[in-house]
A protein has these predicted regions:
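Extended beta-strand/beta-hairpin segments
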Residues: 1-51, 58-139
Length: 139
């Protein structure tokens, strides 16, 4: 099985900056305390986690639908990770997944159980079992 890698270099104290280099990317992503907990431009770990969940979920759902003879035309998954202080420590308290899907011949009511199953079974969701993940399937 493949092993995926990310390398992080942090320079300086809390007001320093870091760079995340993903194994397959040609450029790193800059992140800082302010891009994480304030409104500064830059990436942050929660955004990367949300992206990992949304992409894993979309791939799992596309695979599931294809196996059920309903290949999707497009799936757009959005994930929003919420980070809050819990007992004085920053904690990811939930992730909200939103799905818009164009699946020819499939209604929203028919798509929703497939989306729920993909959410429960994708590897990133399984790794995040301690975090509540909600799913809204939209028209």
């Amino acid at each position: 099985m493949p092993v995926r890698k990310a390398v992080v270099t942090w320079t300086g104290a809390r007001d320093g900056a870091g760079e995340v280099r993903l194994g397959s990317a040609t450029q790193g992503l800059r992140y800082t305390w302010a891009s994480r907990f304030e409104e500064e431009v830059g990436s942050n770990p929660e955004e990367l986690l949300a992206g990992a969940l949304a992409s894993c979920f979309a791939m799992a759902l596309a695979s599931r639908l294809t196996r059920n003879n309903a290949p999707p035309k497009t799936l757009t998954a959005t994930a929003e990770a919420t980070v809050e202080k819990v007992e004085g420590e920053w904690t990811i308290t939930g992730v909200a997944l939103h799905l818009r899907g164009d699946v020819p011949g499939m209604s929203l009511a028919e798509l929703t159980p497939h989306a729920e199953a993909a959410k429960a079974g994708c590897p990133v969701s399984r790794a995040l079992k301690a975090v509540p993940i909600t799913l809204v399937v939209e028209e």
